[in-house]
């Protein structure tokens, strides 16, 4: 009952319920699925759907009370193609046939950061981007990297930040309650 781990080593083949012919057919089918829509996801990763979701009002905006077209009109500044311009190299997660991950180049614009940050995923971009009316891509890369390194879930953190901004918007909280920091929609410096 207090088993902590099991380590197995060897070179015996592990039998499967399906034969090698079926495995080859399944592999071919899954690799073929990478064409078309899957190819787009492979190329850009989940940031490739960010601007589409914003344009269709499917991405959260202003704590789910706004519309990206009006409240975050420059959301296209964070579209997948622009994210790729800041990407150094690609990688794939283990056993994932899409392999959409990316390692970012060093940042030298509004935010200076070291090379090696992971490409932000759609959920991070939506929760810290359109949800907070933030169209600064480098801030999204920095926030994504900070959350990853600290073990913080970006969806929950972005939602909490939106609630905080809404409290400021309605006068429930002020800068005096927040160590002098004013929180306004779209203020990427306050977000970071």
What is each residue range found by the language model?
Residues 1-192:
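Intrinsically disordered, low-complexity segments enriched in small residues
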